[in-house]
């Protein structure tokens, strides 16, 4: 899908190799200002063509003096747009403007106290407060015309600004939650130094995306969307349905690996709230047949993926055959998000793909043009747009769920009996976490069945050998990193008691308290 014509002028985050570049863009958007990420290798011409409202120079792992270190193009500072430097970007900006970056040998990593002397960025904040530092080199002299507004033990110039030039920067990372006042500082740059308006709201986003989809598909075009039951595909489908009405057909493949109530939720709640046409393919038997005897995690993923391709192909072929008016479907809707675009090297331009490229396995003589209405959004924005469109909270607030479903939450062979055990345990855990009001604190809570493990237990007057269930509650902002959620003991006790009493063949419940890294969120 091409860059929407209605997208506002972006605040461009120039990525110098930072692990937080996407997070910076998210923080800008949280301030109701549109932002995108561009690589530092982008030419001045390419950046200028995006008509940026401001530039933010991200952090990075390098020293400005290191061989091969990413370079700031000085011409970017001459575009006449506001510029904000963070960490490495702060040093690179200083270096380019004639300040001095010293290799002091005094490194600062983690929580660090800074002392500020006012200025626009820090005015009104505590004179001494904690920020998150991650630097080796340090700026010891600001460029001419800049006012030094903060310092730390290892950074003589920890913040500087020149309001007249609409330029500022900080040595620390304002985008991370370990800098408690970081978002305030970022917003002050955007609104008070750069003078930008805060107009990027869920209502505006939704209407812009609807208009863009309507323009792409046209007055007579037809589209197909594969629903997974997740929030991304649901919101993408709702946007397209709002744009083209009954010219959209949704296909939902029930592979038998769903959690309790998920198929019904799609068939009832989604259809009721959108009015979309829906075809459900009941393919549980086909998937279980392919998974018989398979225990290797990667082999399971591949088997599920390959069978999904075939199932989706059959469902689409059936839809085209049963609805002659849909035989000229030219568009395929997908719930691609902005992090996917950035991580894949993203680029603009219409994506015309062979049908087997992304969902795979469609007839070779069928070509679709991709419609990706969410390709500029982060997950939290997708949820906000979903609420704006009137989707039920059960769909919008749904925790992330892997495509292979419960198939990769059973450690061992996947069977119908084991799926039923896991569904019951998962439903109990989800219900009790919701009842405890913890849905807002937990990014997701995989429930895992150790099907190949037999744990000894005592129930009643006899010894039992049952399977352990693992609870994996994690908190995260983007799933790139995660911490285990500190669920109150009384809630854990209730979950454990219910599972061991109500679910057959389970006699032990354990909690996974591993952060990511080193552990991934899913077990397989």
From Swiss-Prot:
GMPS ATP-PPase domain sequence ranges: 200-398
Task of the protein: Catalyzes the synthesis of GMP from XMP.
Domain named Glutamine amidotransferase type-1: residues: 10-199
EC number: 6.3.5.2
Organism lineage: Bacteria, Bacillati, Actinomycetota, Actinomycetes, Mycobacteriales
Keyword Ribosomal protein included in the entry's annotation: no
This protein's encoding gene: guaA
The name this protein goes by in its record: GMP synthase [glutamine-hydrolyzing]
Keywords, comma-separated and alphabetical: ATP-binding, Glutamine amidotransferase, GMP biosynthesis, Ligase, Nucleotide-binding, Purine biosynthesis
UniProt source species: Corynebacterium ammoniagenes
Subunit (UniProt): Homodimer.
């Amino acid at each position: 899908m091409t860059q929407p014509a209605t997208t506002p002028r972006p605040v461009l985050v120039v990525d110098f190799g930072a692990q937080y570049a996407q997070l910076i863009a998210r923080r800008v958007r949280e301030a109701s200002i549109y932002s995108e990420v561009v690589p530092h290798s982008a030419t001045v011409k390419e950046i200028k063509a995006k008509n940026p409202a401001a530039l933010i120079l991200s952090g990075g792992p390098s020293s400005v003096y290191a061989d091969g270190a990413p370079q700031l193009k000085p011409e970017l500072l001459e575009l006449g747009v506001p510029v904000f430097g963070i960490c490495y970007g702060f040093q690179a900006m200083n270096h380019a403007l004639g300040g001095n970056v010293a290799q002091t040998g005094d490194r600062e990593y983690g929580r660090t106290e800074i002392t500020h002397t006012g200025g626009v960025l820090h005015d009104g904040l505590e004179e001494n407060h904690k920020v998150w530092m991650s630097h080796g080199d340090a700026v010891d002299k600001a460029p001419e015309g800049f006012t030094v507004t903060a310092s730390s033990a290892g950074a003589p110039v920890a913040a500087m600004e020149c309001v007249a030039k609409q330029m500022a920067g900080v040595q620390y990372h304002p985008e991370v939650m370990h800098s408690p006042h970081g978002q305030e500082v970022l917003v002050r740059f955007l609104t008070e130094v750069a003078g930008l308006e805060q107009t990027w709201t869920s209502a505006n986003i939704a209407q812009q995306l609807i208009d863009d989809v309507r323009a792409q598909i046209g007055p007579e075009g037809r589209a197909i969307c594969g629903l997974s039951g997740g929030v991304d595909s649901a919101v993408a489908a709702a946007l397209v349905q709002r744009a083209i009405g009954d010219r959209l057909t949704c296909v939902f493949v029930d592979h038998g690996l769903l959690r309790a109530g998920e198929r019904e939720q799609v068939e009832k709640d989604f259809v009721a709230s959108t009015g979309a046409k829906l075809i459900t393919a009941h393919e549980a038997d086909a998937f279980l047949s392919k998974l018989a005897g398979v225990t290797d995690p990667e082999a399971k993923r591949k088997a599920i993926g390959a069978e999904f391709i075939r199932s989706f192909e059959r469902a689409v072929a059936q839809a085209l055959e049963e609805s002659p008016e849909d035989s000229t479907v030219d568009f395929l809707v997908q719930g691609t998000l902005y992090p996917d675009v950035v991580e894949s090297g993203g680029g603009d331009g219409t994506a015309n793909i062979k049908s087997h490229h992304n969902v795979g396995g469609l007839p070779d003589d069928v070509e679709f043009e991709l419609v990706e209405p969410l390709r500029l959004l982060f997950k939290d924005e997708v949820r906000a747009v979903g609420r704006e469109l009137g989707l039920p909270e059960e769909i919008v607030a749904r925790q992330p769920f892997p495509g292979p479903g419960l198939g990769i939450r059973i450690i061992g062979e996947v069977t119908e009996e084991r799926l039923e055990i896991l569904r019951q345990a998962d439903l109990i855990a989800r219900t009790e976490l919701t009842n405890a009001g913890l849905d807002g604190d937990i990014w997701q809570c995989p429930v895992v069945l150790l099907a190949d493990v037999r744990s000894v237990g005592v129930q009643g007057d006899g010894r039992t050998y049952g399977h352990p269930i693992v609870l994996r509650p994690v908190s995260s902002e983007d799933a790139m990193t995660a911490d285990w959620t500190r669920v109150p003991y009384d809630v854990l006790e209730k979950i454990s008691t219910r599972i061991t009493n109500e679910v057959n063949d389970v006699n032990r419940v354990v909690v996974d308290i591993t952060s990511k890294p080193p552990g991934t969120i899913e077990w397989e």
